[in-house]
């Protein structure tokens, strides 16, 4: 999904473009400060690979892939967005380690989810989070996510907790 811009109190969320993928972005995936909880960063990636990943998603109408900007500090992605079931699966990556644990998740998730609700009539947001990522689980619960044993997504890893948030 292209050309989306959402303003929050501290950030501008906007559709990613290939040019947003630079060495700094690559360090979020390959660097020593990468998050241990991001599946995509489990193997080394090249700039070419990451740009292709971004390009495919930005051009897919069932994906909302936004960068978190004041300066680019991370991304939030809804993939896939199922318009028939009025639900989306969310992932969040705070790439800049100095922005982790700064309470940006509620601001970013609420703004982008409400945009999906108001613009696309999405009513449910689902996610999977590593059971060891206690900070993220608490943050999601404060937003309104509930732990769910059965979701619209299949979770086969016993270390992943399924969570769901109703936007109604």
Give names to the regions the model predicted.
Residues 1-51:
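A short, well-structured alpha-helix characteristic of acyl/acetyltransferase catalytic modules
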Residues 15, 80-82, 152:
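Short, low-complexity Ser/Thr-rich regulatory SLiMs
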Residues 43-98:
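Acetyl-CoA-dependent GNAT
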Residues 88, 123, 130-137, 150-168:
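C-terminal "cap" of GNAT-fold acetyltransferases
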Residues 101-115, 138-142:
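Conserved acetyl-CoA-binding loop-helix of GNAT-fold acetyltransferases
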Residues 141-151:
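Conserved acetyl-CoA-binding loop of GNAT-fold acetyltransferases
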């Amino acid at each position: 999904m292209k050309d989306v811009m959402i303003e929050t109190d501290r950030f501008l969320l906007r559709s990613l473009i290939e040019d947003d993928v630079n060495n700094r972005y690559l360090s979020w995936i390959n660097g020593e400060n990468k998050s241990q909880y991001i599946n995509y960063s489990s193997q080394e990636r090249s700039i070419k690979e990451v740009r292709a990943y971004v390009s495919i998603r930005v051009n897919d109408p069932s994906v909302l892939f936004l960068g978190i900007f004041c300066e680019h500090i991370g991304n939030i992605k809804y993939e896939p967005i199922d318009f028939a079931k009025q639900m989306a699966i969310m992932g969040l990556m705070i790439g800049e380690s100095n922005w982790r644990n700064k309470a940006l998740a509620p601001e970013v998730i609420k703004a982008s989810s409400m945009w999906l609700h108001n613009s696309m009539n999405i009513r449910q947001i689902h996610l999977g989070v590593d059971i060891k990522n206690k900070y993220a689980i608490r943050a999601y619960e404060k937003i309104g996510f509930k732990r769910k044993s059965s979701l619209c997504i299949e979770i086969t890893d016993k270390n992943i907790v399924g969570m769901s948030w109703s936007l109604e």
